[in-house]
Amino acid sequence: MQHSSAGSEERITSSTSSPRSGHKTASSLFGLLSKRPSKVEPHPVTPESPRLQQRPVSACGQYDVSFAKCNADTSANHVNNNGSTLKSQTLPLEKSHSGLISFHRRAKPSSSKGKNHSHRHSTDAGSQSDGGADVVMRRKSPKHRSPNHNRFSHQFSLCCKAEKKPMTPPVTVRYNSIPDSNSVLRRDNLSLSWSMVDNNSGSLHSSEGSSHRPRPSSECASAPESPVASKTFFAHCSPAAASASVARSESLQNRSPIRPMAVSACRSRLRLKLYPPGQELPPLQAATEPGDIKRATTPQHMSSPNIATQPDGIEHIEEQPGVRFMSHENMTLQRQGSGSNLARQTLMAAHALNLIPADNARERSYLDGRLGSTSLLGPSELSRVLPQKEITVFVGTWNMNGHSPPKQLNDFVLPANVEHVPDIVVMGTQESTPDRFEWEVTIQETLGPSHVLFHATTLGTLHLAVYMRRDLIWYCSVPEDASMSVRTGSAFRTKGAVAISFCLFGTSMLFVTSHLTAHQQKVKERVSDVKRIINALDLPRNLPNQRHKNKDVTQNFDNVFWCGDLNFRLGEPREKLLEWIQNTKFPLPSHLPHGYMHTDQLTSVLADGAAFRGFMEANITFPPTYKYDPGSQNFDTSSKQRAPAYTDRILYKYRQMQGLVIRRQTLVPGVSTPTQPHVQCLLYDSVPSITTSDHKPVWALFRTLIRAGTDAIPLAAGLFSRDIYLEGMRRRLNNQYSGASAVCVLQ
């Protein structure tokens, strides 16, 4: 074997006929030069060669591929058909591995064409446009290639010659399977399209093939896993090595189709973006079902699977709720989800506005308390309107001190810590503004179109209004009201109480607001006022089954809510209370005892039962609500020097109702937990941001259970104050754009 020195020359001659140019420098290199030189004698291509193995024309297109042994010791020059002498090119050679790939045109009979086809050694099959040209390339020294760039170059020796028709499409060589003499090696279905192969690297594009063609036995093995990284495609291997390659091929089929490769990072990253991280891709299979989508195939790198033949994978995506990538399939799923949500909303609307059979309307019920086949206030209607059989009630009280309310009442009517608008909103005021219409419209404007003014009543400076959701007014009885003044001979009735009562389904409710006698020492007078009010209010008057009506009005209703300026004070000096307020951070923890509530007069009255028997109050966590300087957060600095007190209070009371015994789940076996209260106070707070009065508003949020009723009660039939509603909506619409400027500002 002869080794060439660093200064030796290597001649590579390539020629193909081209109609446009007879001589043109080749644009790319189709051979691989190695570091270890050896002289190679190409095997002459003749039809009589017994050792010549050729590929079928269908696999190689316009080319015939032949394989021959390379002789390391042969250094003679070879003569082509034209008589020109070509020098042998120096290629690497191993002792046990040698091979030659010879591309040539199939010989045509001399009778059909008189043209002589010359066979020349070529390293480039020619570009797609010019068809190739004659070129002689000199290389002074072997080009250095790193082991990573061509790690298999020392194991193979290649010698190629090819010829191409002018102006022909690119040649496609399918390396689907290259069988050995003893075993057949099947690889993945990959086809390589050679295009623009330059002198430095071979650019490969791959697309998937679907056919396995038989190959004649040869000494060439299949392509490695990463042909771009190694740039080596054939190797001489023994039968044992072929068997190992078959095992490696079977293991590769069980592996995920995606292989992380630095060269094909762009294609691989695009493929990975289309599937969730950590999820293996489904196996490659053609669409057999009639509903399957067939996508057009596009050439892509052989290291990444063909995306066009992959299944949609929607089933796998639907199993993962937290998919965070965006693809065509995901956006389709989102559109399908939007459609399903729309269908679900349509079904819900149809359930709310269900169709009424005509037979049900024709029926008459002979049972007491029913208007038809089903009761309007019965259990079925209650379950449809209130599936949880409970509502929320908002109760607010405020001594307005005769001043007009602020324009914004969101802090009072819709506090920030209330998540949903309550079903019933009750507002009781004392020393109210003379313009009651303005006050009612202001509340209506704040609540919005979902609520209507169900009923309102007034006595002197006392005012009580009940707002309710629009869809609940059809299930209420006719509201009733009553009032009582504790100062009978006074021209200005500032002390007393007003009340409103009604039934919602089968639950009766009573709302009372009162203004009791003032001053620190008049506790007995206030207790007397409460007793007189309870006995004077004649409610209900029109509800059935009221033959055994109690003199105590609070005993005639299921739920009672009492609010107002009750004027009960704290039994501590003013200076001590101011110091305690200044050193205390509000709101107080609800589970801790209040610092000075043990000196509160109302707390003592509730504990003794002298008044408000059976009433309860939630824990107070806010500072005293009386008395402030109007327009500020300072307590009274006038000459009267009133001590801070909790004069504005909200109390509630309920009685056990049959059919509403709801027990909680037993936590300990054999020990039952207490029943759920029919009225529960959820929130209890004040509104310090409103400073128009010397009192701070106080509000409470309750949750109460509702039971079914009968149709024998006088129905309100959708009664509400239409004038208040229309005016409130008109103002709400106008105020919506009041802060917007009429001048268009261009930026």
UniProtKB/Swiss-Prot annotation:
Record-given protein name: Inositol polyphosphate 5-phosphatase E
Gene3D superfamilies the record matches: Endonuclease/exonuclease/phosphatase
Report, from the record, the phenotype seen after gene disruption.
Viable and fertile, however flies display a decrease in extracellular sound-evoked potentials. This hearing defect is likely due to the increased levels of phosphatidylinositol 4,5-bisphosphate (PtdIns 4,5-P2) in the ciliary base that results in the abnormal localization of membrane proteins such as ktub, iav and nompC.
Where mainly located?
A: other
Q: List the disulfide bonds.
A: none
Q: What class of enzyme is it?
A: hydrolase
- Which PANTHER family does the UniProt entry name for this protein? INOSITOL POLYPHOSPHATE 5-PHOSPHATASE E (PTHR47039:SF1)
Q: Which SMART domains does its entry note?
A: IPPc
**InterPro entries from the entry?**
Endo/exonu/phosph_ase_sf, IPP-5-Phosphatase_Type_IV, IPPc
User: Briefly, what is this protein's role?
Assistant: Converts phosphatidylinositol 3,4,5-trisphosphate (PtdIns 3,4,5-P3) to PtdIns-P2, and phosphatidylinositol 4,5-bisphosphate (PtdIns 4,5-P2) to phosphatidylinositol 4-phosphate (PI-4-P). By controlling the phosphoinositide composition of the cilia membrane of auditory receptor neurons, regulates the cilia localization of ktub and consequently the transient receptor potential channels iav and nompC.
Q: Is Plastid included in the keywords of this UniProt record?
A: no
Q: Which organism is it from?
A: Drosophila melanogaster (Fruit fly)
Q: Does the keyword Hydrolase apply?
A: yes
According to the record, the residues making up region (Disordered) are 1-57, 106-134, 201-224
Q: Please list every transmembrane segment annotated in the UniProt record, as residue ranges.
A: none
Q: Which GO terms describe its biological process?
A: phosphatidylinositol dephosphorylation; protein localization to cilium; sensory perception of sound
Recorded hits in Pfam families, A to Z, give:
Exo_endo_phos2
